[in-house]
UniProtKB/Swiss-Prot annotation:
Belongs to the DNA mismatch repair MutS family. GO terms for molecular function: ATP binding; ATP-dependent DNA damage sensor activity; damaged DNA binding; mismatched DNA binding. This protein is involved in the repair of mismatches in DNA. It is possible that it carries out the mismatch recognition step. This protein has a weak ATPase activity. Keywords: ATP-binding, DNA damage, DNA repair, DNA-binding, Nucleotide-binding. It comes from Yersinia enterocolitica serotype O:8 / biotype 1B (strain NCTC 13174 / 8081). One of its GO terms (biological process) is mismatch repair. Pfam families: MutS_I, MutS_II, MutS_III, MutS_IV, MutS_V. PANTHER family: DNA MISMATCH REPAIR PROTEIN MSH1, MITOCHONDRIAL, DNA MISMATCH REPAIR PROTEIN MUTS FAMILY MEMBER. It comes from the Bacteria. ATP binds at residues 614-621. HAMAP family: MutS. This is DNA mismatch repair protein MutS. GO terms for cellular component: cytosol.
């Protein structure tokens, strides 16, 4: 219920609630009442379903019972985490007035808005995964796209050229929340995503966006960021920044700049390629047996997130890549020693974001202190490493002795979770705080003495002094001894087996204790905020340090992986082509129980396309994918699973590997296959690496073979891309005779009787047969079916020159050299000018009989 027209008919408290709710109509409003956050009306119904909490009713307002649901204040974060995972947002409304001095309802206001893309609390985040907020814009000039990781301050923009590139960006970044304009036309691109937020058009206004961004960065213009003319991207960035300011309700000092991502800087991979190569997610949607699962042994969460960004954004800048390679080489001897202090650094990046948002908790500051304490050891280990990039990173890491000293003096060794729990600031840091604490502690000592004195004086062995939040301090005596208490004991509370009393002396000390504790807590909160003020001026250097530490973690991890998994340093060449000796699939070799068979590969301007034939299960797909993964690893600066590798310039990686029906979009397997193929033929260049696996198998044999042939021809002669073309159509093995730069290779297998051994080794030349029946037998197809299939195969092979045999779907017999019809031959031999009308009529009957 969001109707505020008849506020007067509601109670004062519900009037206050409805006014606040009207400001946040589309999200759940958690309204603080004492020890609970309550939700009312439609919010209560929705929350009870989403969070599995009880739906009750609270009295009545405007003559109607009020649906209500609530959660305890101390467990709110658990419920928010669940909402965020469901793509929902929530407004948190706190009591900011004093109940003792308030006339009518206590003053309340919304102090924060939690949304999937703007959370920074560690309880709400997956620690080894980026959590991005994104905004998308589209007009006649193309797309604009902006992403922000509020938990690090990383702000990126791009202008994807077309729908395909935009889809790839969405898949790569996978935002937790996506803002889009109300007139967005390509809803099919985003409608299946969680966390969609429709925004009014004026939030994407260009001049407003520029003003917002300049104000945030403290600049006069955006020329220094290289985005001044990127109008579509700036519209998206402006909307995104405004949304963050609206939800965070605080300044954002950790967002200090904007980076333009340009397609030409990296290796472009479309959405299908990212999916097929299983970089961070497997085809089932899980994370097992992915490249990241094998490669990621980083010791910090921020390092893990950086590694995954590198995986998804292979770069082309050979200077950066060579720096990384040299750093990996330089770290190989000290990896284990370096990872020990790095592990202790923890997730400094996200702690700094919470510091910037002033939401850092006491334990965040303790972790920051612990991170600073590791820096001297990191410097000691890295100073002897004579690699320029390592020394550059080390200078960025820096040392923060003064801040370390501040936190060592100010924060206790093991602080509580929240400032409001007290006991965060260390003794000796502030004299006034120590005085009030001494008063509180002294009063506590007095109460202990009072208990002993009263027990001995009255001879009541069950007497004890206690405290609870409702009744304050009390003297408790068992029901059996309650008749023995003196007259000045005033009864405060009756329990089943005991009575509780108050005496004037106890009341006096209660006031003293509560006053001193309250005063100490107030001072402590003030000092805690002051510590933020002392740390925040150093935020830029701290962020630089955290980024350098994350990169050191990634490089040390890649050094360890190279050593453990026997990877070698690839050579990055400016000459076109790819030459790999002893290449292996990084994931498959770790999953296999038997040794992995390594294979060579050579692609060059004279050897542009490999036509790959061989049995199913022979390893064609593995061979193709491992080539793409080796190229990708080389372009993130990593060592690669090969004895040697020389990689020339690569601008894009395309894969047309396997397919499944896209039922959600109503597209068949063949339609998916052809869409991906069209994308390759439109966008591949001479420097692209293209993997084509079983093209044309989703339709009839004639159609499929014709398409496969035409695609192979186009890639080899017009585009001249570096192509691995796996096929079951043996007709394609004649392509090398017809075209330059095309070569046959095959995966070897040995057949013995009815059994088959896959050798998994790549040999020159075409495969002699497909071994399909042997594979079927391995798969458990019944023996009588296999036997019948062998009979049929012999029949078909004996009819291999008969055109009818070529119509059997999936056969690998000659299909292109069709027999010429006798009727056609007779027609070609005829001279129509020499025929009389009678002869012509006879020929028509004769031809009819031939057909």
């Amino acid at each position: 219920m969001n109707n505020t027209d008849k506020l007067d008919s509601h109670t004062p408290m519900m009037q206050q609630y409805l006014r606040l709710k009207a400001q946040h109509p589309e999200i759940l409003l958690f309204y603080r009442m004492g020890d609970f956050y309550e939700l009312f009306y439609s919010d209560a119904k929705r929350a009870s379903q989403l969070l599995d909490i009880s739906l009750t009713k609270r009295g009545a307002s405007a003559g109607e019972p009020i649906p209500m649901a609530g959660v305890p204040y101390h467990s709110i974060e658990n419920y928010l985490a669940k909402l965020v995972q469901l793509g929902e947002s929530a407004a948190i409304c706190e009591q900011i007035g004093d109940p003792a001095t308030s006339k009518g309802p206590v003053e309340r206001k919304v102090v924060r808005i939690v949304t999937p893309g703007t959370v920074s609390d560690e309880a709400l985040l997956q620690e080894r995964q980026d959590n991005l907020l994104a905004a998308i814009w589209q007009d006649a000039r193309g797309f604009g796209y902006a992403t922000l990781d509020i938990s690090s301050g990383r702000f990126r923009v791009a202008e994807p050229a077309d729908l395909e590139t935009m889809a790839a960006e969405l898949q790569r970044t996978n935002p937790a929340e996506l803002l889009y304009p109300e007139n967005f036309e390509q809803m099919s691109l985003i409608e299946h995503r969680h966390g969609l937020r429709r925004r009014p058009l004026w939030e994407f206004e260009l001049e407003t966006a520029k003003q917002q961004l300049n104000l945030q960065f403290g600049t006069r213009d955006l020329i220094g960021f290289g985005v001044e003319q990127a109008h579509q991207a700036l519209r998206a960035a402006g909307c995104l920044l405004q949304y963050v300011k609206d939800t965070q309700r605080t300044s954002l000092p950790h967002i200090r700049g904007l980076t333009m991502e340009r397609q030409q800087d990296g290796i472009v991979m479309d959405a299908a390629t990212r999916r097929n190569l299983e970089l961070t997610q497997n085809l089932s949607g899980g994370t097992e047996n992915t490249l990241a699962a094998i490669l990621d042994c980083t010791v910090t969460a921020m390092g893990s997130r950086m590694l995954k960004r590198w995986l998804h954004m292979p770069i082309r800048d050979t200077k950066v890549l060579t720096d990384r390679q040299q750093a990996i080489g330089g770290l190989q001897d000290i990896t284990a020693e370096l990872q020990t202090p790095l592990r202790q650094v923890g997730d400094l990046e996200r702690i700094l974001a919470r510091l910037a948002l002033r939401t850092a908790r006491p334990r965040d500051l303790a972790r920051m202190r612990h991170a600073f304490q590791q820096l001297p050891e990191i410097h000691r280990l890295l100073q002897p490493v004579n690699v320029p990039h390592i020394q550059n990173l080390l200078s960025q890491v820096g040392q923060f002795d003064e801040l370390q000293d501040l936190l060592e003096r100010a924060i206790v060794e093991t602080p509580p979770v929240l400032v409001r729990d007290g006991g965060v600031i260390a003794s000796g840091y502030n004299a006034e705080l120590d005085e009030w604490r001494a008063l509180a502690d002294g009063a506590t000592d007095y109460l202990d003495r009072l208990e002993i004195r009263e027990r001995e004086k009255l001879g009541l062995d069950t007497l004890k002094v206690g405290f609870n939040g409702v009744h304050g301090y009390y003297i408790q005596v068992s029901r059996g001894q309650s008749h023995l208490v003196p007259i000045h004991y005033v009864r405060r509370q009756t329990l089943k087996n005991a009575e509780r009393y108050i005496i004037p002396e106890l009341k006096e000390y209660e006031d003293k204790v509560l006053t001193s504790k309250g005063k100490a807590l107030a001072i402590e909160k003030g000092l805690y905020e002051e510590i933020f003020d002392l740390l925040l001026p150093h935020l830029p250097e701290l962020q630089t340090s955290a980024n350098a530490l994350a990169e050191l973690d990634v490089l040390a991890n890649l050094a360890e992986r190279a050593e453990t998994l026997n990877y070698n340093c690839p050579v990055l060449s400016d000459k076109p082509g790819i030459k790999i000796t002893g290449g292996r699939h990084p994931v498959v070799e770790q999953v296999l129980s038997e040794p992995f068979i390594s294979n060579p590969l050579t692609l060059s301007p004279q050897r542009r396309m490999l036509i790959i034939t061989g049995p199913n299960m022979g390893g064609k797909s593995t061979y193709m994918r491992q080539t793409a993964l080796i190229v990708l690893l080389a372009h993130m600066g990593s060592y690669v699973p090969a004895d040697q590798a020389t990689i020339g310039p690569v601008d894009r990686i395309f894969t047309r590997v396997g397919a499944a029906d896209d039922l959600a979009s109503g597209r068949s397997t063949f339609m998916v296959e052809m869409t991906e193929t069209a994308n390759i033929l439109h966008n591949a260049t001479e420097q692209s690496l293209v993997l084509m696996d079983e093209i044309g198998r989703g339709t009839s044999t004639y159609d499929g073979l014709s398409l496969a042939w035409a695609c192979a021809e186009n890639l080899a002669s017009r585009i001249k891309a570096m192509t691995l073309f796996a096929t079951h159509y043996f007709e394609l093995t004649t392509l090398p005779e017809k075209m330059e730069g095309v070569v046959n290779v095959h995966l070897d297998a040995l057949e013995h009787g009815e059994t088959i051994a896959f050798m998994h080794s790549v040999q020159d030349g075409a495969a002699s047969k497909s071994y399909g029946l042997a594979v079927a037998a391995l798969a458990g197809v019944p023996r009588d079916v296999i036997k019948r299939a062998r009979q049929k195969l012999k029949e078909l092979e004996s009819l291999s020159n008969n055109a009818a045999a070529s119509k059997i779907d999936g056969s690998q017999l000659t299909l292109l050299n069709e027999e010429v019809s006798p009727a056609v031959e007779a027609l070609e031999a005829l001279d129509p000018d020499s025929l009389s009308p009678r002869q012509a009529l006879e020929w028509i009957y004769r031809l009819k009989n031939m057909v």
